[in-house]
């Protein structure tokens, strides 16, 4: 028998067939329930829709090994804890780069709404989160859309990215390894990540503890490329010693 939660999610799916996104307030009005009820529906269990930046969007599905819908429901509180720490690094009037990934929207959410800042991103989900910040000037880089991770891969970096030198770049990664460095699942993410590594003044890697010791197919770079590594808890001694040797600040 279909539960009320399943029925509501089914209605949201039908609505998202007509539109690429649905604001939380509009969804609540459509279903005749509170916004908190919808938040609970989407947070309690994995669902084919997800709430990002105040908008309900359909989870992108493809043959990729890395699906946002699969990752989003994992270690939510741990990601949120790391994200809150990372957000404390933001100061007024800075220009910031935000990577793709399921931790990044939590960083944006944790930034004080009174702080004015400029943001550069290449992920649809990241952009939707930035839209909710009242004093954010957001730039979404265009290019070829990849549904598996909801990013736009730029065709010409001269169009937008090369006009920026971010104060801070916030990166996500699916793997963190002492010798292999920071890695992710998708090769198409690398051009923008590498651009940020060459142009930003400060580099901050934000990962939950499950990423340590993992190696994924696409290599971002050595860990020593990052000034700060933020996580939800202290990593193993191997990483602590490496950070001390390379003068990388650990935040947890």
Swiss-Prot record:
PROSITE patterns reported for this sequence: HTH_DEOR_1 (PS00894), HTH_DEOR_2 (PS51000)
A Pfam family this chain is assigned to: HTH_DeoR
InterPro entries associated with the record: Carb_Metab_HTH_regulators, DeoR-like_C, DeoR_HTH, NagB/RpiA_transferase-like, Tscrpt_reg_HTH_DeoR_CS
Residue ranges of every copy of the HTH deoR-type domain listed in the record: 5-57
Any Gene Ontology biological process: regulation of DNA-templated transcription
SMART domains: DeoRC (SM01134), HTH_DEOR (SM00420)
DNA-binding region (UniProt annotation): 22-41
Molecular functions per Gene Ontology: cis-regulatory region sequence-specific DNA binding; ligand-modulated transcription factor activity
Keyword Cytoplasm belongs to the record: no
This protein's UniProt keywords: DNA-binding, Repressor, Transcription, Transcription regulation
Entry keyword Mitochondrion: no
PANTHER family with a match to the protein in the record: DEOXYRIBOSE OPERON REPRESSOR, HTH-TYPE TRANSCRIPTIONAL REGULATOR SRLR-RELATED
Quaternary structure annotation from Swiss-Prot or TrEMBL: Homooctamer.
Protein's job: This protein is one of the repressors that regulate the expression of deoCABD genes, which encode nucleotide and deoxy ribonucleotide catabolizing enzymes. It also negatively regulates the expression of nupG (a transport protein) and tsx (a pore-forming protein). The inducer is deoxyribose-5-phosphate.
Official protein name in the record: Deoxyribose operon repressor
Species in which this protein is naturally found: Escherichia coli (strain K12)
Gene of this entry: deoR
């Amino acid at each position: 028998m279909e539960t009320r939660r399943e029925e509501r999610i089914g209605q949201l799916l039908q609505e998202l067939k007509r539109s690429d996104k649905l604001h939380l307030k509009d969804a609540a009005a459509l279903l005749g329930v509170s916004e908190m009820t919808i938040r609970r529906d989407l947070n309690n269990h994995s669902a084919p829709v997800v709430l990002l930046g105040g908008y309900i969007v359909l989870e992108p599905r493809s043959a990729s090994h890395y699906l946002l819908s699969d990752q989003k429901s994992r270690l939510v509180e741990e990601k949120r804890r790391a994200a809150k720490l990372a957000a404390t690094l933001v100061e007024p009037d800075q220009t910031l780069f935000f990577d793709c990934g399921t931790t990044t929207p939590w960083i944006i959410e944790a930034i004080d709404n009174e702080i004015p800042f400029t943001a550069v991103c290449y992920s649809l989900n990241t952009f939707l989160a930035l839209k909710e910040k009242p004093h954010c000037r957001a730039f979404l880089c265009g290019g070829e859309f990849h549904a598996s991770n909801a990013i736009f891969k730029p065709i010409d970096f001269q169009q937008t990215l090369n006009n920026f030198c971010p104060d801070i770049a916030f990166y996500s990664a699916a793997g963190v390894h002492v010798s292999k460095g920071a890695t992710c699942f998708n090769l198409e993410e690398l051009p923008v990540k590498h651009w940020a590594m060459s142009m930003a003044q400060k580099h901050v890697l934000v990962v939950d503890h499950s990423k340590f010791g993992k190696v994924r197919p696409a290599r971002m770079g050595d860990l020593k490329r990052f000034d700060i590594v933020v996580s939800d808890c202290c990593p193993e001694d191997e990483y602590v010693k490496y950070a001390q040797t390379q003068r990388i600040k650990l935040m947890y």
